[in-house]
């Protein structure tokens, strides 16, 4: 249990620092699209797909490595990678409508919650 916690902790720290560094370098490059955020989301999706493919074939590897890379590193880099993997699993299972629903709910839900949180802060500050 302790090794699992440490793996997630270390991987998460590494992913978070990388996300920050990439965002600091790339976001100022374009005023319309946060390129750093896009880059880490795409990178995270690629890494988690690569990791799952590798770990499914190399079953002798210690599961702690999977935790470090997927839950820790990719989770720290972006939660978008986990979402992407879940959609891929739904598509692989032939559950296309559920994959679409999952995509729409995650994207729209996240945007709505972000907007609601922003509006709440504006409302509280206006009181």
From Swiss-Prot:
It is found in: Cell inner membrane. This is Fluoride-specific ion channel FluC. It catalyses: fluoride(in) = fluoride(out). Fluoride-specific ion channel. Important for reducing fluoride concentration in the cell, thus reducing its toxicity. It is a multi-pass membrane protein. Keywords: Cell inner membrane, Cell membrane, Ion channel, Ion transport, Membrane, Metal-binding, Sodium, Transmembrane, Transmembrane helix, Transport. It comes from the Bacteria. Its main location: membrane. The gene is fluC. The chain crosses the membrane at residues 2-22, 35-55, 68-88, 104-124. Belongs to the fluoride channel Fluc/FEX (TC 1.A.43) family. GO terms for biological process: cellular detoxification of fluoride. Na(+) is not transported, but it plays an essential structural role and its presence is essential for fluoride channel function. NCBIfam families: crcB (TIGR00494), PRK14196.1 (NF010792). It comes from Serratia proteamaculans (strain 568). Na(+) binds at residues 75, 78. GO terms for cellular component: plasma membrane. GO terms for molecular function: fluoride channel activity; metal ion binding.
């Amino acid at each position: 249990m302790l090794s699992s916690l440490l793996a997630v902790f270390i991987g998460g720290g590494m992913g978070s620092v990388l996300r920050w560094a990439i965002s600091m370098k790339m976001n100022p490059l374009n005023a319309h699209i946060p390129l750093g955020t896009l880059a880490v989301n795409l990178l995270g999706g690629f890494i988690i797909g690569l990791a799952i493919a590798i770990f499914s074939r190399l079953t002798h590897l210690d599961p702690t490595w999977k935790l470090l890379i997927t839950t820790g590193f990719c989770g720290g880099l972006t939660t978008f990678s986990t979402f992407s993997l879940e959609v891929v699993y739904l598509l692989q299972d032939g559950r296309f409508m559920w994959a679409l629903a999952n995509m729409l709910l995650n994207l729209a839900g996240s945007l709505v919650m972000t907007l609601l949180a922003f509006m709440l802060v504006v409302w509280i500050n206006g009181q």
